[in-house]
Amino acid sequence: SSLVGSEMCIRDRFNNARQKQENQIKAIRSYISQRVDYIVFSPIVEDGWETVLQEAKEADIPVIVMDRNVSCDPSLYTAWVGSDFTEEGRNAARWLEEDLKGKKFDQKETVHIVVLRGTSNASATLGRTKGFAEIAKTHPNWEILDSDDADFTTAKGREVMEKYLQKYKDIDVVVSQNDDMTFGAIEAIRAAGKTTGTGGDITLISFDGTRSALEKVKSGVINVDIECNPLQGTYIQEIINRLEDGESVDKINYVEEKVYTQKNVLSVLGDRVY
């Protein structure tokens, strides 16, 4: 990018690493050699970034990590912008607490829960799992029957849900760690002759808050959707502006996120852009 007076001209050099860490590392090295002003990237996995981030630091290029975390020395990057995945997990469990209270669920009666996890070791998977478990363990009657990776895809969500339905005859709650897996789970549950959502056989908790899933919240097929806000560009722009002005920036920058049910979903569906 180049700076003209006080106006910033950002030329985006975009690289799609196709879900491969080695491609991301190669792209970052290429940006370092091009002497770009800033590098912004969303890491596919948490580990294995030390070397390339050290190279960026030595080249004096600020790195802004977005969306997912990196597990390395924080001094190797300038700032991180993204979701508080652990808080998202807690929000899901808090919603379930209230929902069970509303249904006058006997506190001694067992609540049978299955979990569709995302990609193994992804920040969203680790955080959402941890946050939900923190609150679940305070409820002795919440039993997590099974928790398996379904890789954030519809096809795998359906496959893992089919396996759960064959294995367990009594499932009360499905916690699905993203909307795509939820769509697969809905297909499997319907194929098994069961219903989900408001007044359904199975309570369905989803994450992401994409428009297509929020339509299903509106129609009562999904009970609740915990938002994962992807609109991080304005936060990143703000960080770059501050750095350009010589100001300090926070290391951790959480985006604002909400919990959507039938009660409040209409307020966002109108102008939802994702």
Language-model segment annotations:
Residues 51-87, 106-112, 210-218:
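Flexible loop/hinge segments that line or gate small-molecule binding clefts
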